[in-house]
A protein has these predicted regions:
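Acidic, metal/ion-coordinating pockets
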Residues: 1-168
Length: 168
């Protein structure tokens, strides 16, 4: 299975490149499943309904975010209606949206995508991503064939620590 994960798509130039190149890249690499981080897609901060509609026209399976997810407050009005648009899972309970989703690829592979956010130098400071990831991994191992974690963090040390944590 070939998976494409695209980092932060930033503002109009990033959306243009994605619109112009994504299908070609997916075809040339025989991509089966695509995840794109969209947290900076609207003017460099957040996502709007219009920008989300642009992404809907592309072949994207899941969209992730990070600390800028709420920079455009209108995201609060549509995130619950878009289960493939994730916000970090380690936001407190009751936060709109979801931090994880299980989708089936075109080939029938069950892919779980978990969106997490680090704590170091991030605002707001969320619940421990390590504890939060442990809460879902055991359940997911029964429900998915592939587990992807998009860990949005500032420091290399926290990213490496999460890598070691997830490696078992």
């Amino acid at each position: 299975m070939n998976i494409l994960m695209v980092g932060d798509v930033v503002a109009r130039p990033g959306r243009r490149v994605l619109r112009e190149r994504l299908a070609e890249l997916q075809d040339s690499l025989e991509i089966d499943f695509t995840v794109v981080n969209v947290e900076n897609a609207a003017g460099g901060f957040g996502i709007t309904a219009n920008v989300l509609a642009e992404f809907r026209a592309l072949s994207i399976d899941v969209m992730t975010t990070g600390n800028h997810v709420w920079d455009k407050k209108e995201a609060l009005t549509f995130i619950d209606d878009n289960p493939d648009l994730l916000r970090p899972h380690n936001y407190p309970a009751g936060t709109p949206g979801s931090g994880w989703v299980v989708r089936e690829s075109a080939g029938g592979v069950r892919v779980g995508v978990l969106n997490m956010m680090g704590q170091a130098f991030m605002h707001p400071v969320l619940d421990s991503p390590f504890a939060a990831v442990d809460q879902v991994l055991e359940q997911w191992q029964k429900e998915t064939d592939v587990l992807l974690v998009d860990f949005h963090a500032e420091t290399t040390s926290e990213k490496i620590a999460m890598g070691w944590h997830l490696d078992g």
